[in-house]
UniProtKB/Swiss-Prot annotation:
Glycans are attached at residues 284, 417. This is Endoplasmic reticulum transmembrane helix translocase. It comes from Mus musculus (Mouse). Changing residue 530 to N: Loss of ATPase activity. ATP binds at residues 530-532, 623, 681, 746, 861-865. Residues 883-945 are annotated as: Arm-like. It catalyses: [protein]-with a C-terminal TM segment(out) + ATP + H2O = [protein]-with a C-terminal TM segment(in) + ADP + phosphate + H(+). Keywords: ATP-binding, Endoplasmic reticulum, Glycoprotein, Magnesium, Membrane, Metal-binding, Nucleotide-binding, Phosphoprotein, Protein transport, Translocase, Transmembrane, Transmembrane helix, Transport. Belongs to the cation transport ATPase (P-type) (TC 3.A.3) family. Type V subfamily. Endoplasmic reticulum translocase required to remove mitochondrial transmembrane proteins mistargeted to the endoplasmic reticulum. Acts as a dislocase that mediates the ATP-dependent extraction of mislocalized mitochondrial transmembrane proteins from the endoplasmic reticulum membrane. Specifically binds mitochondrial tail-anchored transmembrane proteins: has an atypically large substrate-binding pocket that recognizes and binds moderately hydrophobic transmembranes with short hydrophilic lumenal domains. The active site is at residue 530. Residues 509-538, 724-882, 946-961 are annotated as: P-domain. The modification Phosphoserine is found at residues 896, 902.
Length: 1200
């Protein structure tokens, strides 16, 4: 058997694997073993590299061997030999021995835990690279970027059909098998998706049971469901996370330091919080699990007859019957339609509200090879979709006919390999979720750790000067100081801010699947928009037909000639459902409505407003993106005769059809270009009389015979009006210091016109990049009116963008990608319109902007945008219609509208359009309506996005089609970001004050009682809770928030405020000491029972006052969130804290003071404390505001 080769990531740059921290197996292999190429096929969509490993025996693992075999025995040996200078008792452990043991235990714990935190570390610690296929037990699978995280998976061994052993593994529900004979690589299971049409047309399914068993073994079952882990498994995963482990460690230290109440209170809070997150995770997983198809019986042609088979037992290669199901069952897998026609509702999969027509391949050329990219839209029915109507195969023709009168289809893919399965995998394993425990948080903690180490070192050095002091207790205190820089409540506080925004967005009909992306919305620099259906409306308006008269004059539809009528009435893919509903492309519906013809179920069209014969559609050659045209064969009865006269009708892109016309107007190109510049959509129409044809000729006629020698019958001109609020929203986004970019598949001239209308473009000329017409020629920038022509090489993109607006087409992008990718990367940030781009190119634009360091937002709808939405920092998917459940819940007799708390209102009926509140409405009615809406919303829990809810791969989904949601997301993002940053400032100040209190003051005998620590913790928790409840302001400000913690303003304000607090604390401490009895002993007894004293009471009151001051001073307020007086809960929380401080200072309740271990303070000293507190507050506030004025306003980095 062939040997598993050395695994090197394919396509990675040298050292690429080291970038992600994976251990590199040695390049030199054992003698006698052949070194094969990379273990994964180059260009695999999911897997980048595979590394083979063998699990080590328990005692040989690095998590056990160095510790059990070396470090612990060495420590015990040193203790036994008296190296540590051991006393007579085990209680008198020398500090060196204690430090050594603690260090070994900590290193051991971290080593074990690092295996939980990192797959690469786990492999290095517990496995060894192995190249002998007989010994390999696991493989480490590294996915391609943005496709989940690295996993260590078991390697399975099965017997193949030829009796040889086959190695395979499963990664993210996809099976990979090792090809030992040819490629020496792991390959995904090959599904029958690239054969010639003759293979499918002549296929008769599985004839023998042995073939079925072999297929089941190769492809697995047709199940796309996930197993929901139990509570304990998920909780264990969270309980071993770095933050949680650290927090539990801190709680343990506090318990050792006799802070029992505080420790138990904090630990309970942590466990409850993590448990609630696990419950929420389990609920979400259960919802996702329900999205998979439910098994049902389906007719399958096996062993030469039709028989009912459970849908989860279907395998690729089966012939199945597909049709409309009375139980509304979904299509169980991806199938190729062989015979019969279907109308399919794909909304459950793509969010596309328009049902799609699917055509069979029975009459297509047998030599043509199935291309899923090109053929899927027309011939493949995807799993998870619903057949709303089907036309069974004609009885007169030969071939298979299902017993249930369904359509005949060939099974292509099953399980998680289907389109629906891929979407489910995206939800389960896709882009790594953004969490609170990010790199910035850790760097921030390391910054604070510097001060903590200095404080701990001071305690150790000063504390060890007293020979009688317990070194164990001193070591414990030093450890506590080091841990104090990471507040245990940090993740909770970050989550609180995010959850507040989550609830606010839910009330605005927005659903978020990745809540920790919300702060990224506050950092957004570039906002990218799709055009069709996002910026422009779906309600299309047919302006008329151009090119029939002189120049670009548009003829009204009522005055067009009969040939144009026939071309428009017949050349479409529309279908009528059983209930009379017309389904198909909105553009084609608008055209048929404009000419006022009626379509019937049997493919006939009849005029309503003009007197002429009806048409019967015989053959459709559907629109394809590559061909940019559609043609049909139709017929009408001659007057006074039953003879049929056949016609050809063609419509498509004007530049494509030009060569097909026998003659056309001399200003043909000028007309369609000029109209496109005005923002209209233009399609050329062709017509041809074919005369009499036999039935066989009509059935066998080729597309080429229709698409030649055509008569030009006009340009159909369709306007796509902008959505009512697009202009206002884009203006608001631009005024808020964002760069806006359009990324669309539409015509560049139309796209540029819309961009100009929306003020994306404010330059006099827009240059479009034209790739060379011949090889070797340079690319050219050409203005829309062709008055400016510049070579691409002339000047830098930045200089060019200062004078002109730039538009890049899909062709231009593809050319630069192939010729000069570096120049393309420099150009992308300066382009304002990307037109005629394919879905993959949209994704490329977004990932390129991210690579260049820009925080990007993508807003779009439909399947074309899924990749871009998934990879953007903030992806917002718009739904064309609000979900029915929301609509039905809100129907009232008056059908009153819903008011969002940002101004615009949205109708409860899907038929009503978005509008602004009329200024005449009384404020009271506004308030009543708002309160009613909020009551309605509170009745529902936050919904889980279902597969029908559009681009489920997007982190944000808006249930309304207005782009107003982008403003809501940015407002909430900025508010959350500012809240998060101010929390970090507050935590930093509190941590620094605590480090000083626990070091210098601790050695002077100042410490807090358990009750004091608990009261302080409760008051602090109240302030943190309400500071996270801040709401954004109604309008976006031009000022941008600081994007991260590490900036000059944050560092300086923290250091200056700390200096003010530090000096105040030192001054009051010394004043209190001067008023206290002199110390008799040289060294303070740090371990005696807590005793109230003037010094302790002064420091405690000062510490509480400073903590409350940090909240009041560092609360940001306008322009990103409501001001402090408007945040009533926080004001009340600060007021309660202030009253508590004043009460404790004045001693208004002696019993209360006594309970919390405070002594009576002399009156004159109370005045001193009060004055110092006031001065401390004023100086810290002044320092922050001055720094804010000079350093606190960042500028937009992107070229504008």
């Amino acid at each position: 058997m062939a040997v598993v080769g050395n695994a090197v990531p394919c396509g990675a740059r040298p050292g690429g694997a080291r970038d992600n921290g994976s251990p590199q197996p040695g390049s030199r292999l054992r003698p006698g073993l052949a070194a094969g190429p990379a273990l994964i096929a180059n260009g695999d969509e999911l897997v980048a590299a595979v590394w083979p490993y063998r699990r080590l025996a328990l005692l040989r693992r690095l998590t056990v061997l160095p510790f059990a075999g070396l470090l612990y025995p060495a420590w015990l040996g040193a203790a036994a030999s008296g190296c540590w200078g051991w006393g007579s008792s085990w209680t008198q452990i020398p500090e060196a021995a204690l430090l050594a043991l603690a260090t070994i235990c900590l290193a051991h714990a971290l080593t074990v835990l690092s295996g939980h935190w990192s797959v690469h570390a786990h492999c290095a610690l517990t496995c060894t690279p192995e190249y002998d296929p007989n010994k390999v037990t696991f493989v480490k699978v590294v996915p391609t970027p943005n496709n989940g995280s690295t996993e260590l998976v078991a390697l399975h061994r099965d017997k193949g059909e030829d009796g040889l052993e086959v190695l395979s593994f499963e990664f993210q529900k996809i099976k990979y098998s090792y090809d030992a004979l040819e490629k020496k690589q792991f390959l995904p299971v090959a599904f029958p998706v690239g054969n010639a049409f003759s293979y499918y047309q002549s296929n008769r399914g599985f004839q023998e049971d042995s073939e079925i068993r072999a297929a089941e073994k190769k492809f697995g079952s047709n199940k796309a469901e996930m197993v929901v882990p139990d509570f304990s498994e998920l909780f264990k995963e969270r309980a071993t996370a770095p933050f949680f482990v650290f927090q539990v460690f801190c709680v343990g230290l506090w318990c050792l330091d006799e802070y029992w109440y505080y420790s138990v209170f904090t630990l309970s809070m942590l466990v409850a919080f993590e448990a609630s997150l696990v419950q929420q995770q389990m609920r979400n997983m259960s919802e996702i699990r329900k999205m998979g198809n439910k098994p049902h019986m389906i007719q399958v042609y096996r062993s030469r007859k039709w028989r009912p088979v459970a849908s989860d037992d279907i395998v690729p290669g089966d012939i199945v019957s597909i049709g409309r199901s009375p139980q509304e069952n979904l299509v169980p897998c991806d199938v190729l339609l062989l015979r019969g026609r279907c109308i399919v509702d794909e909304a459950m999969l793509t969010g596309e509200s328009v049902p799609q027509m699917k055509e069979p391949i029975e009459d297509l050329s047998p030599d043509r090879v199935l291309d899923l990219q090109a053929d899927a839209r027309l011939h493949v029915i995807f799993g998870g979709t619903k057949v709303v109507q089907h036309i069974p195969p004609q009885k007169a023709t030969s071939g298979l006919k299902p017993v249930d009168n369904g359509c005949v289809a060939f099974v292509l893919r099953t399980g998680f390999n289907t389109s629906q399965g891929r979407l489910l995998r995206t939800i389960l394993f896709g882009v790594k979720r953004v969490t609170a425990n990010n790199l910035e948080t850790f760097i921030f903690i390391l910054f604070l750790l510097v001060f903590a180490i200095a404080a701990a070192a001071y305690v150790w050095v000063e504390g060890t000067k007293d020979p009688s002091r317990n070194r164990y207790k001193l070591f414990l205190e030093c450890t506590l100081i080091l841990t104090s820089v990471v507040p245990p409540e940090l993740p909770i506080e970050l989550s609180l801010a995010v959850n507040t925004s989550l609830i606010a967005l839910a009330k605005l009909y927005m659903y978020c699947t990745e809540p920790f992306r919300i702060p990224f919305a506050g950092k957004v620099e570039v906002c990218c928009f799709d055009k069709t259906g996002t910026l422009t409306s779906d309600s299309l308006v047919v302006r008329g037909v151009a090119g029939l008269r002189d120049g670009k004059e548009v003829t009204p539809v009522s005055s067009i000639p009969i040939e144009t009528h026939r071309a428009l009435a017949s050349c479409h893919s529309l279908m009528q459902l059983d209930d009379g509903t017309l389904v198909g492309d909105p553009l084609e519906k608008a055209m048929l409505t404009a000419v006022d013809w009626t379509l019937t179920k049997d493919e006939k069209v009849f005029p309503r407003s003009i007197k002429t014969q009806g048409l019967k559609i015989h053959q459709r050659f559907h629109f394809a993106s590559a061909l940019k045209r559609m043609s049909v064969l139709a017929s009408y009865e001659k007057l006074g005769s039953t003879d049929l006269c056949y016609i050809a009708a063609v419509k498509g892109a004007p530049e494509t059809l030009h060569s097909m016309f026998s003659q056309c107007p001399p200003d043909y190109h000028h007309i369609h270009t000029e109209i496109s510049r005005e923002g209209a959509r233009v399609l050329a129409l062709g017509y041809k009389e074919l005369g009499h044809l036999t039935h066989q000729q009509a059935r066998e006629i080729k597309r080429e015979a229709l698409e030649c020698s055509l008569k030009f019958v006009g340009f159909i001109v369709v306007s796509c009006p902008l959505k009512a609020d697009s202009k206002a929203v884009i203006r608001e986004i631009q005024n808020a210091s964002h760069r806006v970019v359009m990324i669309t598949g539409d015509n560049p001239l139309t796209a540029c016109h819309v961009a100009q209308e929306l003020h994306f473009i404010d330059k006099a000329h827009t240059l479009i990049l034209h790739p060379p017409s011949e090889k070797g020629q340079p690319c050219e920038w050409r203005s829309i009116d062709s008055s400016i022509v510049l070579p691409l090489t002339l000047g830098s993109p930045k200089a060019l963008a200062l004078e002109h607006a730039l538009c890049l087409t899909g062709d231009g992008l593809a050319h630069l990608q192939a010729v000069d990718p570096q120049q393309l990367l420099c150009l992308i940030p300066h382009v304002q319109v990307f037109a005629r781009v394919a879905p993959k190119q949209k994704e490329f634009v977004i990932t390129s902007l991210k690579e260049l360091g820009y925080v990007t937002l993508m807003c779009g709808d439909g399947t074309n945008d899924v990749g871009a939405l998934k990879h953007a920092d903030v992806g917002v998917a718009l739904l064309a219609n609000a979900p029915e459940r929301v609509v039905e819940r809100r129907r009232r007799p008056r059908d009153s509208p819903v008011l969002s708390n940002s101004g615009p209102r949205v109708s409860r009926s899907t038929k009503q359009k978005s509008a602004l509140l009329s200024p005449e409405e009384p404020p009271a009615s506004h308030r009543d309506r708002l309160s009613q809406v909020l009551r309605d919303l509170e009745e529902e829990s936050t919904p889980i996005v279902k597969l029908g809810d559009a681009s489920i791969a997007a982190p944000f989904t808006s249930k309304l089609s207005s782009i107003q949601c982008i403003c809501h997301v940015i407002k909430q993002g900025r508010c959350t970001l500012v809240t998060t940053l101010q929390m970090f400032k507050i935590l930093a100040l509190n941590a620094l004050i605590l480090a000083y209190s626990q070091s210098v003051l601790y050695l002077e005998g100042v410490k807090f009682s358990d009750f004091q620590a608990t009261l302080q913790g409760l008051l602090l928790a109240g302030c943190f809770l309400f500071i996270s409840r801040s709401k954004p302001l109604k309008t976006l400000s031009r000022e941008r928030p600081l994007p991260n913690i590490f900036n000059l303003y944050t560092i300086l304000t923290v250091m200056l405020q700390f200096s003010v607090h530090f000096l105040s604390l030192v001054y009051l401490y010394r004043e209190a000491q001067a008023r206290s009895p002199e110390k008799q002993e040289q060294f303070v007894d740090l371990y005696k029972e807590f005793e109230p004293s003037l010094v302790n009471s002064t420091v405690y009151i000062m510490a509480m006052a400073m903590q409350m001051a940090t909240f009041a001073i560092n609360y940001k307020g306008p322009p990103f969130m409501e001001s402090l007086p408007e945040n009533k809960p926080l004001v009340w929380s600060l007021a309660v804290s202030l009253l508590a401080i004043i009460g404790l200072l004045l001693g208004s309740s002696p019993d209360f003071n006594s309970q919390f271990g405070l002594v009576d303070i002399p009156v004159e000293f109370k005045l001193v404390i009060g004055q110092v507190l006031a001065l401390d507050f004023c100086l810290a506030l002044l320092a922050d505001r001055v720094l804010q004025f000079f350093l606190g306003t960042p500028k937009l980095r992107v070229p504008s």
